[in-house]
Amino acid sequence: AAKNYNDVIIVASQAQYKPLLDMLMEHGATSSLEERRWMAKEAFAVSSHYDSAIFNYFDAGEGSAFRCSVNSQKQLRYGENPHQKGYFYGNLEAMFDQIHGKEISYNNLLDINAAVDLIDEFDDLTFAILKHNNACGLASRTTVLDAWKDALAGDPVSAFGGVLITNGVIDKEAAEEINKIFFEVIIAPDYDVDALEILGQKKNRIILVRKEAKLPKKQLR
């Protein structure tokens, strides 16, 4: 039916019932080619998503072909550059709770992904600083404060404007030291109330609480 959109309207979802009725009532029970084409596109979106899910199930990760279909999307502030558009497909809320700051950008997401990949390599209490997807400081110590100080000592210049991540709970003492530099994003499994008050003093600073969900073992770039 979708292939015959020149003469046929296909309805792929219950959510389209009301818009379709409104359209038919407005145009005297007729539709334009442009409207039928749009409905056909929506139908193929549904069927291709279904077919991709079936293929990936039977392919079982063998990688004979890459087919990915994700319905949910989040528009980002911009893409890699300000004049470009950027979208995130998936459920970011399954990984993080954003409790403060501006919207996450495309470049923020790249750094966040690299940061999570890096910190997951460590079982000991660790603090890492990343800039442009690369670590510019990292330390494993017995306290978050000591780990932060030694990670920063690795390259205090490059840390400016970076992404910070730790696998430990950030307390007030650590937050007071961290707050002395400018950074874009900070990620931790939790924060003390006093620490949040300190780190939240900058309006645009992105503060993320990382949930227990793990990144997939297999990634395609």
Regions found by a protein language model. Give the residues of each.
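Active-site cavity-forming subdomains of large catalytic enzyme subunits
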Residues: A1-Y5, V11
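A structural signal for short, well-ordered beta-strand segments and their strand-loop junctions
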Residues: I10-V11, I129
